[in-house]
UniProtKB/Swiss-Prot annotation:
Biotechnology (record note): In yeast (Saccharomyces cerevisiae) engineered to produce opiate alkaloids, the expression of COR proteins leads to the accumulation of neopine and neomorphine as major products.
Predominant subcellular localization, coarse grouping: cytoplasm
Pfam families associated with the record: Aldo_ket_red
Name assigned to this protein: NADPH-dependent codeinone reductase 1-4
PROSITE patterns named in the record: ALDOKETO_REDUCTASE_1 (PS00798), ALDOKETO_REDUCTASE_2 (PS00062), ALDOKETO_REDUCTASE_3 (PS00063)
Annotated site residue numbers, Lowers pKa of active site Tyr: K86
The protein's enzyme class: oxidoreductase
Disulfide pattern: none
SUPFAM superfamilies documented for this protein: NAD(P)-linked oxidoreductase (SSF51430)
GO BP terms: alkaloid metabolic process
Length: 321
């Protein structure tokens, strides 16, 4: 199924995923009618891939929008959609993975997910989601048993595929050493200001699809940056191509062989973001983008602890690898 010209990517497990999805993180209108209407509008204009998570607190609104889209005839079947959600760190324990997924399904009013991701490579003491995580709650993840529980979720049919998010090459190696079903996706920050070249090469060699988040700098998030949208290089390319800076950034990610999720509640920008697949950046454009200074926008500070598995950003991201 293609919608509004969005290509389908075949993951290593054989299932197909729209190359572009709508993100649902960090909305300022969580749990409101406006949030539901934004998701409904996204379906109406052509989005078929939605990326949510237990921690985003957007699952229930997305579920309501899906139900309404079916009632309105915007889609004929839930099978037309590709729904991704994520396992929160406090549930990243072998005995809590399946209950957490089942809770997400209840929130979404769905019988299955298309993709379920481990949100971060770290666990927390079990409990409800909190914005301020006590440092003594941060624990190392038992990759072997947690991933085995993820595999069980797929085997039981509650999700069609499983993957990870915010994993470095080193952490992927640790997880895959004991995996019976390899992860099909690693969702990470990637943009013209964070190329992730080494990670992309590793994932490609291991048949793991990169899904890029924060493609436009995560503007509006507490850790957001204007580096992408203010880039003179990207502005020059955008003017030359008759495109927006956002479209250039998204197109660059796609031309690197990655899929992506982006978020907008503005109908005009929703439509604009879909229009990145019928044109290409030139080799000269790509060369210019390759020279843009690199910096990470995402911060792992909230998951760092003197007594936890990761004490510094460098340890969390394995930046020195």
């Amino acid at each position: 199924m293609e919608s509004n010209g969005v290509p389908m990517i075949t993951l290593s497990s054989g299932i197909r995923m729209p190359a572009l999805g709508m993100g649902t993180a960090e909305t300022m209108v969580k749990g409101t009618e406006r949030e539901k209407l934004a998701f409904l509008k996204a379906i109406e204009v052509g989005y078929r891939h939605f990326d949510t998570a237990a921690a985003y607190q957007s699952e229930e609104c997305l579920g309501e929008a899906i139900a309404e889209a079916l009632q309105l005839g915007l889609i004929k079947s839930r099978d037309e959609l590709f729904i991704t959600s994520k396992l929160w760190c406090a549930d990243a324990h072998a005995d809590l993975v399946l209950p957490a997924l089942q809770n997400s399904l209840r929130n979404l009013k769905l019988e299955y997910l298309d993709l379920y991701l481990i949100h971060h490579p770290v666990s927390l003491k079990p409990g409800k989601f909190v914005n301020e995580i006590p440092k003594d709650h941060i624990l190392p993840m038992d990759y072997k048993t947690v991933w085995a529980a993820m595999e069980e979720c797929q085997t039981l049919g509650f999700t069609r595929a499983i993957g990870v998010s915010n994993f470095s090459c080193k952490k992927l190696q640790e997880l895959m050493a004991a995996a019976k079903i390899p992860p099909v996706v690693n969702q990470v920050e990637m943009s013209p200001t964070l190329h992730q070249k080494n990670l992309r090469e590793y994932c490609k060699a291991n048949n793991i699809m990169i899904t890029a988040h924060s493609v436009l700098g995560a503007i509006g998030a507490p850790w957001g940056s204007n580096a992408v949208m203010d880039s003179k290089v990207l502005h020059q390319i955008a003017v030359a191509r008759g495109k927006s800076v956002a479209q250039v950034s998204m197109r660059w990610v796609y031309q690197q062989g990655a899929s992506l999720v982006v978020k907008s509640f503005n109908e005009g920008r929703m439509k604009e973001n879909l229009k990145i697949f019928d044109w290409e950046l030139t080799a000269e454009d790509m060369e210019k983008i390759s020279e843009i200074p690199q910096s990470r926008t995402s911060s792992a500070d909230f998951l760092l602890s003197p007594t936890g598995p990761f004490k510094t950003e460098e340890e969390f991201w394995d930046e020195k690898d």
